[in-house]
Amino acid sequence: MLRSITLSPTRRFGFPPRCVSFTTIKELILTEENDGSSLHYAASSPCFLLLSKCTNIDSLRQSHGVLTGNGLMGDISIATKLVSLYGFFGYTKDARLVFDQIPEPDFYLWKVMLRCYCLNKESVEVVKLYDLLMKHGFRYDDIVFSKALKACTELQDLDNGKKIHCQLVKVPSFDNVVLTGLLDMYAKCGEIKSAHKVFNDITLRNVVCWTSMIAGYVKNDLCEEGLVLFNRMRENNVLGNEYTYGTLIMACTKLSALHQGKWFHGCLVKSGIELSSCLVTSLLDMYVKCGDISNARRVFNEHSHVDLVMWTAMIVGYTHNGSVNEALSLFQKMKGVEIKPNCVTIASVLSGCGLIENLELGRSVHGLSIKVGIWDTNVANALVHMYAKCYQNRDAKYVFEMESEKDIVAWNSIISGFSQNGSIHEALFLFHRMNSESVTPNGVTVASLFSACASLGSLAVGSSLHAYSVKLGFLASSSVHVGTALLDFYAKCGDPQSARLIFDTIEEKNTITWSAMIGGYGKQGDTIGSLELFEEMLKKQQKPNESTFTSILSACGHTGMVNEGKKYFSSMYKDYNFTPSTKHYTCMVDMLARAGELEQALDIIEKMPIQPDVRCFGAFLHGCGMHSRFDLGEIVIKKMLDLHPDDASYYVLVSNLYASDGRWNQAKEVRNLMKQRGLSKIAGHSTME
């Protein structure tokens, strides 16, 4: 016999104070059944009122228990409500148990169960339930088709997606939502031709349909086709929405189409579409990857609610564009507004610390990541590389050894770090250890080792590594990256013929490849070869970069081609909009100093917008020694030691200048001053075998 139960007003179960008589509930339900009323719409039913008061999983389970205990679970409407609530709270297994207890679920209950899985992003279960639904012979329904197609899209399940398409063909009619879902499924599964066919079959195309097709092109790296389709969309007088413009900006990012990206940015502003966080991040990414860091910062500054993703995008942008100090400054500001960084932020900042060898800040960021628990493989690998770049091999090795699972990225981080800081033998030893631990290297590993061999000047080791790379197929699969490192190795080891042979075998040469070969000719004193290859590069419509101009200017300087050097230096900032770096100014100073045009060289040093470094001063003082212009040398010495009073390398330059003029006493005084200040010269070494 059913008993009356008083429900406690305990907060834990989420109920208000209420007494419910289940005898009354049963009588009401029986009355409704006798009247022929549908319990799907029995909003006033006590059972439904009870379930509607459930505000958490505990209260729902208690109510479920009460209904089961009183024999009220045979009704399909109550089961449907329970399934819906379990799905809403994220307990799909409980929902499925209720569903399976109904011997003959109606179509509405099937749809509710399907919606539960969709709501909780259980796409595999959506596809399984859809198959089961079709086997039961239920009628076709647009909502069911849409949810099943969405699940196939998320799973990249092309086979089941095609099955649904075949079932759709048998349906007399269905709405555009289903067709757009089908289009989206094909596009995201890489079947762009099938997606385009579906697109052409849609007669009334709305903005969602157009955007899905454009997004399909962009996702499959057919960005130009996506932009053409957008023009067709405009011709059809369909206005884009936030997602349309987000997709178009992504296309411009992939194409490095800065001008087009700016145009879409302008369209966004004119359209009055509110810039969401997602759109702002897309704009930041576009400007950053197109090298327009100033516009990226402008977008960042203009947005009132800057979230973690935007901060991170801006910091990563500065780091990748070489503006490391700005990246680190922004990171400090981010800490000031109490936004907790994530692993991507930390890894990017550590990368920046390594690039400018800021060990102090790198250690501070390391401590912060431990303190607030921001740690993953990317952070560990960035730490290894940062310590290696800062010549802290022991710390780099310690972090590396502490990683429980060393993947290929971890090995590459320490090998490339050691290669770049001059610890060549350690890098080669780690490579041998990597092989002994059965870790398969990749193109990045081999490229780092070629750089190590180039620094070591070891033609024999590098040639063996070349043979190893051919055996493993790296020159075929990673031809540009590995091939460029290989030709650079041969060029630096004095074998330009082998370098040119490798250069000619690389089918898709990038700017770095051309620059490496141009630099290789320059290192051998073949300025004509460098300049001819540079002109060939321009004819191939390859845009030079800063490294290309460094190689060209260096080649002109070593062969006394002053007029040509001046022409290329001027072209660099006038024709290509590059801001000269310290390296470019050093090349110009070296070229003029070698040619005896020391007054012009001094004028460059004094007017440089950035601080000259030891190489720049060294190039000038070397010219002073060559042409016995010690009067000009004295001017630079004063400027140099005022700027760098505690750097031994500058004192060595001064001592060498005095020695070249036979002023041995003054050279000795400089050496004694170094000892008094505790400064010592770093020992040099030969890099040729």
Curated annotation (Swiss-Prot):
One of the GO biological process terms: RNA modification
First-listed, main subcellular location of the protein, grouped into a coarse class: mitochondrion
The entry's keywords: Mitochondrion, Repeat, Transit peptide
GO function terms (MF aspect): RNA binding
GO cellular component labels: mitochondrion
PANTHER family the UniProt entry points to: OS06G0185700 PROTEIN (PTHR24015:SF1951), OS07G0578800 PROTEIN-RELATED (PTHR24015)
Membership in a protein family: Belongs to the PPR family. PCMP-E subfamily.
Descriptive protein name: Pentatricopeptide repeat-containing protein At2g03380, mitochondrial
Lineage: Eukaryota, Viridiplantae, Streptophyta, Embryophyta, Tracheophyta
